[in-house]
Amino acid sequence: MKQGKFDIYVFADWKGMAAPKLMGILSAHYGKGKKAFGFEYDKDWIKTASQRLIDPDIQFFSGAQFPNNKENFGVFLDSMPDTWGRTLMKRKAAQHAREFGEKPQTLYDIDYLLGVFDKTRMGALRFKTSLDGSFLDDDHENATPPWSSIRELQAAAKNLEDDENIDVKKWLAILMAPGSSLGGARPKANIVDEKGDLWIAKFPSKNDTIDKGAWEFLAYQLALKSGIEMNECRIEKIAGKHHTFFTKRFDREGEDRIHFASAMTMTGNSEENLRFHTASYLDIAEF
């Protein structure tokens, strides 16, 4: 693991802002096999009317701040991929190593954070490694695919799940941009509809013993009948016996990004402490 400090410039770009604005700097500190993260607001951001509480561990004052009993801040973990997206990134790193006869690269939180395609990144935080550089990741080789490509996307996800040893370059080329930004463990991808709106397609998994897409759609219908507001959802049977579940991205309105933070972040929890503490909806109500 490299030693020293690595800075990432954090920008806010949510609905109502005329342009992205520097919020502060996320610093990764590496040393003696350990890593820690700190965040410091930009002095101009503290004065702006756009500020809001983005994480209970990041309060409205200047100077370096550090997460409470956690390695990293929850709000930045929310901007990273979860199991499926990380699987894609690891498979890509392994494929690159095989092609060039190298040792596979070990991926860290910074790699996951900056490896997400900026256009489809969840939420409204954006990241740079230099102020005059591009928002990362800026690899436009694989644009968000149209709805018409859903059969190919589902086939790619199935191939990656089915065999750890296949030549994955073709399938990764199809899935990296649309799939690496998303959380959760299930195979999924971003797609764009005929109006240009982003959706998430959640594919059947090889481990499914029931039609989870159909059950998720039923939960959506029950939520609507209960008065809960949700973005539009659909199901389609693309291939095989189970449905693919589609949900319109809740963090987008046209080209506008909408900021969000997970319940885990805003209640001050983490994956680690939830191993020893059972969270509930009461925690959300108290927040």
Predicted regions and their residues:
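Phosphate/dinucleotide-binding and metal-coordinating scaffold of catalytic cores
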Residues: 1-287
